[in-house]
């Protein structure tokens, strides 16, 4: 796959069936962060965007064993989500401080 194909596929996945299956990306990552924080005794205070970054790391770990194009597609998707959620979080924090 070339870079455009990877990004198109990531966009299709993020805005298609995956969104229907798991709901809003931010809400889903927020739930995952809450579960991971509980598991880790809330020691780290993970945010939704941390989940996306950690999922990128998981995909990289898998790539060490075997190259798969879907891992690169997933990495592109998680990177886009991390940026979006990070920006959303900043807007929410700014709004709450006013």
Regions found by a protein language model. Name each.
Residues 1-98:
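Intrinsically disordered, low-complexity regulatory regions
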């Amino acid at each position: 796959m070339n870079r455009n194909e990877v990004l198109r596929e990531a966009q299709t996945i993020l805005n298609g069936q995956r969104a229907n299956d798991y709901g809003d990306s931010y809400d889903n990552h927020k739930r995952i962060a809450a579960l991971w924080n509980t598991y880790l005794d809330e020691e780290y205070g993970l945010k939704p965007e941390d989940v996306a970054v950690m999922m990128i790391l998981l995909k990289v770990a898998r790539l060490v064993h075997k190259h798969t194009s879907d891992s690169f597609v997933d990495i592109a998707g998680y990177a886009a989500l991390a940026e979006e959620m990070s920006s959303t979080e900043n807007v929410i924090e700014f709004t709450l401080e006013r």
